[in-house]
Amino acid sequence: MKTYTIRPLDNTPEALAAAVNLLSSNCPSESERYERARLVTEINSVEEQLFYKKFFAAYDLEGSLIAVGGIKAADWASDTHILYMMAVEVEHRGKGVGSGLEAARIQWMRDHFSHGRCLVSTKHKKRFERWDFKIVSEINDRYLMILEF
């Protein structure tokens, strides 16, 4: 039985702060990419409800935030989106939460854009191959992957 729900990240100050805290505490090895000031800026953009950017969240049955992930249009390439800033609380990993967030973000992109591509930078290539992402390059055990639709 699924013990969580996935929906757009709430735009209350409490939800936004919880998302920043979840990302910063669950990605310590990525502190250069997930610098707290950047997290605050990116997450707080939820309040603006931009058409080209969306954050999704997973909530447990009590309504607590257990995972978050974003998708946004690349400002440097037409018809291109980027999956970014995803983290799942340690105790909820391996239960399909991350896969659910990936599915929600990919589906949102397909629902709102008729064609294009989606990029992700990841250490987990098999995770994204199941969504039909293809490897573009590999540097230092990180893969740049692309999904075209």
Regions found by a protein language model. Give the residues of each.
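Conserved acetyl-CoA-binding loop-helix of GNAT-fold acetyltransferases
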Residues: 88, 94-107
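Conserved GNAT acetyl-CoA-binding A-motif
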Residues: 109-123
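Acidic/histidine-enriched, beta-strand-rich ligand/metal-binding domains
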Residues: 84, 93, 127-130
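Conserved active-site alpha-helix within GNAT-family acetyltransferase domains
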Residues: 122-141
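Short hydrophobic/aromatic beta-strand or adjacent loop that forms the aromatic wall/cage
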Residues: 53, 140-144
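Short loop/turn motifs at secondary-structure junctions and domain boundaries
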Residues: 46-51
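Conserved beta-strand in the GNAT
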Residues: 57, 64-73, 80-82, 87
